[in-house]
Structures are given as structure tokens and as C-alpha cells.
Regions:
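Hydrophobic pocket/interface hotspot
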Residues: 10, 27, 35, 88, ...
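Terminus-proximal functional modules
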Residues: 6, 77-80, 91, 133-140
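Surface-exposed, charged secondary-structure patches
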Residues: 2, 36-37, 41-100
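Short beta-strand segments enriched in hydrophobic/aromatic residues
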Residues: 14, 31, 92-94, 123-124
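Residues that flank catalytic or metal-binding motifs in active/ligand-binding sites
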Residues: 33, 75, 106
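Short beta-strand edge/turn micro-motifs at domain boundaries
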Residues: 87, 103-133
Length: 140
């Protein structure tokens, strides 16, 4: 898979129907060990939390989310690949049941390990009305 395909797969696997959970083993396989995630996981989180993958799983499934279901919808993206390293800047929408979509932003750092692209880190935050991204994402 290319870096973009890895990121697409992350969004597919983190989305799930009410009464279930993400396919955590398949999702985990897309990340390096260790990995670092620095995220505002939910729109109401007061700050970004820095965590490892296992802590992220616990944080993501809090507040009865498995009963509601959850979907992440990818939007615009920019990718830069330099040798065995890649950066994918990705806009997406968080969709919770009975709530309007919440615009957000992920920055993925990927590395090619034994010929396979894996996510080494993710930073993420919500996009506020004042921060709506009017220009395409870029790292240059």
C-alpha cells in the first residue's frame, strides 16, 4: 500500500456501526511499535492528549461510543514522500450519531519498514470556523 492507501485504510477501519467497535487488530497493524498519537480525540476535549496506541484505543471508545457508532470521512489531502519517509496532511470530518459533522485535521508521519508503509505518528485537532482551510494542504 502507498502512504495514501494506508491513511485511507485507517479511516475505513476506525469507522463502525452502532453496537460494534473498530477492527482494532487490523487498525493496529497499520502503525509502528512504538507509535505516538497527539490528538484532541473528541470535539469537547479541553486539550490535545499525547498517548501511545493502547491509550488511544481506550480514549477513543469512551463515553459509550460503541453504542452510537462513529464515522470519519476523509476530505482534501496533501502527501510528500522523501525516500523512506512520508507526510500525509489530511482534512476529515468526524461524524457522531445525531450531531453535525465536525471538521478536523490529521498529520500522519509514515515510514517504510521492510518495504511496508506504517504510521509512526499522528497529530490531530479540530478545525474551528475561524480556521477553515481555504488553501490546499501542503508541506512546502
Amino acid at each position: 500500500m502507498s502512504p495514501e492507501e494506508v491513511v485511507d485504510r485507517v479511516y475505513e477501519l476506525i469507522s463502525f456501526s452502532a453496537g460494534s467497535e473498530p477492527d482494532w487488530p487490523a487498525h493496529r497493524a497499520l502503525f509502528t511499535e512504538p507509535t505516538v498519537l497527539a490528538l484532541r480525540v473528541f470535539p469537547d476535549d479541553p486539550q490535545i492528549t499525547v498517548m501511545d496506541y493502547d491509550s488511544y484505543v481506550v480514549h477513543q471508545m469512551r463515553d459509550g461510543l460503541s453504542e452510537e457508532g462513529y464515522v470519519e470521512i476523509p476530505g482534501e489531502r496533501s502527501t510528500t514522500i522523501v525516500g523512506e519517509a512520508a507526510v500525509v496532511l489530511q482534512e476529515f470530518a468526524m461524524k457522531f450519531r445525531d450531531r453535525p459533522p465536525v471538521p478536523a485535521f490529521d498529520a500522519y508521519s509514515l515510514v517504510r519498514v521492510d518495504g511496508v508503509w506504517k504510521i509512526a505518528s499522528v497529530i490531530s485537532d479540530m478545525i474551528t470556523a475561524q480556521q477553515i482551510l481555504e488553501e490546499p494542504l501542503t508541506v512546502r
